[in-house]
Design a protein with these regions (language model features):
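A specific heptad-register position in long alpha-helical coiled-coils used by two-component signaling proteins
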Residues: 136-139
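A composition/secondary-structure signal for short, hydrophobic, low-basic-content segments
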Residues: 72, 105, 124, 143-144
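Non-catalytic DNA-recognition/assembly elements of restriction-modification systems
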Residues: 1-16, 20-32, 119-133, 144-187
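A short beta-sheet element
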Residues: 32-94, 103-106, 111-115
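Short, flexible active-site-proximal loops enriched in glycine and acidic residues
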Residues: 86, 101-107, 123-131
Length: 187
């Protein structure tokens, strides 16, 4: 069934400032637009939730965050109602491209009132579990492939150095010259 975002979650806000976090300690994590910031001795959300960057760089980016944690004021809580799994809500919001709702030239902002009417298909809870499981597997495959590509890139660089040596130190003793001295132009 098609529903609006506002039908399946409640909006929440935080008054925490990033400057207040360093030097504090505790068991409960605090997150910002770039991820984990530090721990404090309290939390603002008891259950898992979705946080959306609402101010500054990265606006519209969604994060799935754990129970007993908090976010700073540049983030906004999307607290799932009982009809939606937090993970399902995360994937839905992640693919809504909320950045299209930004306003403000110097510091961009997005407001829940602007994107609360975004529609999506809400499946029953069993189907949501299936969708989340499938998407986790797909993300895992993508992550593994990215790691493989990075390792292949490292291998190519290592092979180049093995064949030609390090261009900075020239351990092979290659003659140093210019392209103009070694090549000629054919028209």
């Amino acid at each position: 069934m098609r529903v609006k975002l506002a039908d399946v979650c409640e909006r929440g806000s935080s008054n925490l400032k990033q400057a207040d976090i360093p030097g504090k300690s505790g068991d409960y994590p605090v997150y910002g637009a770039s991820g984990y910031i530090g721990n404090v001795d309290f939390y603002q959300q008891k259950k898992p939730y979705v946080a959306v960057v609402k101010d500054g760089a990265g606006i519209g980016r969604a994060m799935l965050l754990p129970a007993e944690s908090s976010v700073i004021g540049t983030m906004q809580y999307l607290l799932p109602k009982s009809v939606v799994l937090p993970e399902y809500l995360f994937y839905v919001v992640k693919h809504m491209h909320l950045e299209k709702y930004f306003s403000g030239a110097t510091i961009p902002h997005i407001y829940f009132k602007d994107y609360q009417n975004e529609e999506f298909t809400l499946d029953d809870l069993n189907k949501q579990h299936e969708v989340v499981t499938t998407l986790r597997k797909v993300e895992s495959v993508i992550e593994n492939r990215q790691q493989q590509l990075q390792k292949l890139d490292d291998l190519i660089k290592a092979r180049f150095v093995e064949m030609f040596g390090d261009p900075g130190t020239n351990p092979m003793g290659w003659k140093e010259t210019t392209i103009g001295e070694e090549c000629f132009y054919i028209k």
